[in-house]
Amino acid sequence: MTAPGLAEIDACVFDAYGTLFDFLSASKRCRGALGDKAEALGQLWRTRQLEYSWLRSIMGAHADFWQVTGEALDFTMASLGIENAALRERLMDLFLNIEAFPDARRVLEALRRAKRTTAILSNGSPRMLTAAVKSAGVEGLLDHVLSIEDAHIYKPHRSVYELVTDRLKIPAERVCFVSSNGWDAAGAAHFGFRAVWANRGKQPRERLPGTLTAEISSLDALPGLLGL
């Protein structure tokens, strides 16, 4: 059944990391080297990656997401007492060539069959997104891949979401924005998108401005919400 607010959607725009792409896949694939620190490294790396993006935005000290990702990994490895340059290089390479969640390709294929415009809007740098889309095997399923580098500031700043309306020439209320990050979904909703939170981790809702249109636990539920 089509969800209220999603009947007149012209485009579906996805966050990348955590939504289409599994940001823990790099640490999982290095479990042999990391041992019992693999999960802690993956989670702390992601947390610092986001925190550094927000702090750099507040400080007016922008650096692209590849640099931020490396700095976050350096902090994480130091925090966990890991000194291994080869392992650091391996983790960064795996993050660059990240794995997609199993439901990512399925939902993009469904949207393609329905002739819906699809896009990514991500903190990732253009180089990172090009590599991720290729490694995930979804190159032919996306009409647009948008990086915050064109806004020179990170989500959830309004100018990032404006990239979508500017490039796609679609009003905000006709865009379905999908993110697994509750704060990102809130930012998108506050901007005016029809925001769908893919709550993969079964987390409580963020106490932030912006009213979500829907909450799902898997991307597989999205086509149904759109009436496809």
Predicted regions and their residues:
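Asp-based, Mg2+/Mn2+-dependent phosphohydrolase catalytic module
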Residues: 1-9, 109, 116, 121, ...
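Active-site neighborhood of HAD-like aspartate-dependent phosphohydrolases
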Residues: 2-50
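Generic structural signal for small/hydrophobic residues in well-ordered secondary structure
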Residues: 15-18, 73, 120, 188
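An amphipathic alpha-helix signature
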Residues: 27, 42, 46, 66, ...
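Short helix-capping segments at alpha-helix termini
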Residues: 34-38, 79-86, 113, 137-141, ...
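A metal-dependent, Asp-based hydrolase signature
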Residues: 39, 53-89
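Short, acidic loop-to-helix structural element flanking the phosphoryl-transfer center
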Residues: 62, 66-67, 84-120, 130, ...
